[in-house]
Amino acid sequence: MHDFQFRAKGDKRLKAFSLQDLKKSHTVNIKWRFQKNNDNGQVITYVIDNINKQHCVVEACKRIYKRAISLKIPQDRPIAVFTQEKMGRNKTSYINDIHIKNLLQEAAKNEYNIHCKKELSAFTSHSIRVGACVLLHTQNISPEDIKFRLRWRSDTFRTYLRNNLQLAEKHRDAIANA
């Protein structure tokens, strides 16, 4: 639970483990314990999105935090957990890359009607970071900011950039306005 630090407006620290204070959260600082780039312990700040709460990192962190408290997860343990029923009993498990891969592949089947195993194999836990990279690129975020915010040490993120509908529309509009 120490990997999330919630703050109110004005960067005021909130009391740790207070569900009442959690409602005042304006930002969350997330400590990334282990990273592929070995920049372990890096802290990144996320700001609440009051317009699009469904995709708000702060709101997601609040749900994760509340779930960890309700499941009595020890404070020194990872809090990305879920419960599932196995043999008539609820079992708490840590969310791992296999769970994420399975959820993303199921979403790809349901949302995009993808059923080819080879195509589905492209949907992995890394897809979230790649998708964020592509989305930021389509929104004209600078390569330096993409690299910094998504924790890339090299320029390999550029290999993930794709042609997509948003870029095709910008290309069309640029030609139309030329």
Task: Locate each region found by the language model.
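Extended, non-catalytic subsegments within catalytic or DNA/protein-binding/adaptor domains
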Residues: M1-A178
